[in-house]
Amino acid sequence: MVSSSVYGQEELLDRIYVLLTSLGYEVWMSHRGSVPTNSNETTLESCLKAVENCDSFLGVITTDYGTTSPGEISITHQEFRKAIELKKPRWFLVNDRVIFARQLLSKMGYKTPEGRHRLGLKTLKPCLSDLRIIDMYEEATEKRIEDGQAKVKWVQKFYDTDDASIFTQTQFYRFLDAEKSIREQYPDLKKRGGRR
């Protein structure tokens, strides 16, 4: 599954879709209309169910926060949280402007979501549509302190579509290789409860 806000990101998402389908993946992506839906479910319910049922997850953090209702976090943000909660095999891309905005606000003393909220800015237009984009990035890194050292998960910064494409192709080709190896080593995996 590819999770991202769509507005202004169509070219990037189209490229990722083509890359992943050319590697043989069935890609669930709302932009392409390929997320399984049910007429009895809300958009959010269908999206979260897709996260639950996907084999792997690519989250793309752009400068647009995505679809949200007043007082709620965006669908994309909720998808990210669900993938992390379920410990899905996952990768994240982040637009370089998100990193820049986070660093700028940190240097100004606004290092936490609470601090950024107290700042009173909802947006840093034209850079970011919503400051919660920085929260998404921080959640994707899953930063924790272990043995006195900060530990974070990899979130790949990208400047343009080519940068994002290189990371996507490299990571998902390697994942496909690993998946093939597991299937060869455990031919009865499906009988044991595996999906494939």
Q: What feature does the model see in each segment?
A:
Residues 1-196:
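Conserved catalytic or regulatory cores that recognize and/or transform ribose-phosphate-containing ligands
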